[in-house]
């Protein structure tokens, strides 16, 4: 790292020194967010929101390709509506924000500020669904959510955040299960192929599942500090909410039946995962598919040739802008070196440099953010080379993250061994569990680790990590400390 670069990023604490502070330094220094006047809330700044827009674009396309439509439901939920489902309310009660006044008048009924929308969707579906011909109902909404968190960190846990939440209704249990699993696959595909983050997928334990759900499926990712992060969930709600909100339909056999439901969602928390999986001591590294700018152009402009270089840069920009997401940085108030460091810190996948000597040789200089590799490319080969690089960077970033996950996945056969691994290495730890919630809680009490995911095809037959009981039905699950 050059001296100038060291000075430029001196406000970023090294990961090895203080990982939490590193994370906060990166999001502030790269202008992803700023702290809002309201405790626990953040302002997502333009660069941070541009990343969310690219993520939203890739996910929204997949959601629509699987037959879903977008809609928008109210932010406010009447207390009586939320109270209809006791378990659901109990799960969210400590985090619900309430509105009790409208202007100067006390409201006749308190309104909850949306913590999630099962109740609102349930109420509307009870009116909309009458016959089997009305099914399935496949609706998604992009919205904000409020959960009054006590301990907050930007993107990872905030009192208000952005997300998408899908809510569907089906004729049969099999259809609902298929839907919940399909959307889990959608999330896995998006997070791995667009965000270059490998995930483990499977079931949540009964203790960790969504309040009111029959089953909760999830994808879990491993951050570079060895802690897990829940990246997305998909819930088979069974008929639980249908019975609470009286969502029934007349089936083909002329019998009135309850629908089967699902809900599923991911949030801006994924940006936190993006930062922690790929980032380094110099800042962000953003995979090309979700990068606001896949390529930044920095003209090298000595005074005498300034106009020539700027003219040539603009000409090249016009050639590239329809094929790639390109940023031409022709600001006069900063030196090329300053710009190099800024865009490197902001994680732009490729930097393109062009100066007088490059113009003479009919070439440009390309520098990769992920590997720091520098190359000279002829102008007539540039588009092909950029296409090749973008694909290679995307693939290499995923492979690097896969290697990290593999290298930091361990196996433990006793609670002591589990604790030692967590203290020395962290990571995902495979261990057998008997299915007893008391054992799950003992592991958490002793090690602060929770069951992150029960793989769909989990190994069976070992001895429980907590109680030692051996049974052919015991499953090998993943434990980790988590965000």
From Swiss-Prot:
Organism: Natranaerobius thermophilus (strain ATCC BAA-1301 / DSM 18059 / JW/NM-WN-LF)
Comment block on domains: Consists of three domains: the N-terminal catalytic domain, the anticodon-binding domain and the C-terminal extension.
PROSITE patterns xrefs: AA_TRNA_LIGASE_II
BP GO terms, sorted: prolyl-tRNA aminoacylation
Reactions performed catalytically: tRNA(Pro) + L-proline + ATP = L-prolyl-tRNA(Pro) + AMP + diphosphate
Signal peptide per UniProt: none
Top-rank taxon, per record: Bacteria
Keywords, in A-Z order: Aminoacyl-tRNA synthetase, ATP-binding, Cytoplasm, Ligase, Nucleotide-binding, Protein biosynthesis
MF annotations from Gene Ontology: ATP binding; catalytic activity, acting on a protein; proline-tRNA ligase activity; transferase activity
Subunit-level organization: Homodimer.
Annotated Gene Ontology cellular component terms: aminoacyl-tRNA synthetase multienzyme complex; cytoplasm
SMART domains from the UniProt entry: ProRS-C_1
HAMAP family in alphabetical order: Pro_tRNA_synth_type3
Family per similarity comment: Belongs to the class-II aminoacyl-tRNA synthetase family. ProS type 3 subfamily.
Protein name (Swiss-Prot/TrEMBL): Proline--tRNA ligase
Pfam families hit by this protein: HGTP_anticodon (PF03129), ProRS-C_1 (PF09180), tRNA-synt_2b (PF00587)
Protein's job: Catalyzes the attachment of proline to tRNA(Pro) in a two-step reaction: proline is first activated by ATP to form Pro-AMP and then transferred to the acceptor end of tRNA(Pro).
Enzyme Commission number: 6.1.1.15
CDD domains from the UniProt entry: ProRS_anticodon_zinc (cd00862), ProRS_core_arch_euk (cd00778)
Subcellular location: Cytoplasm
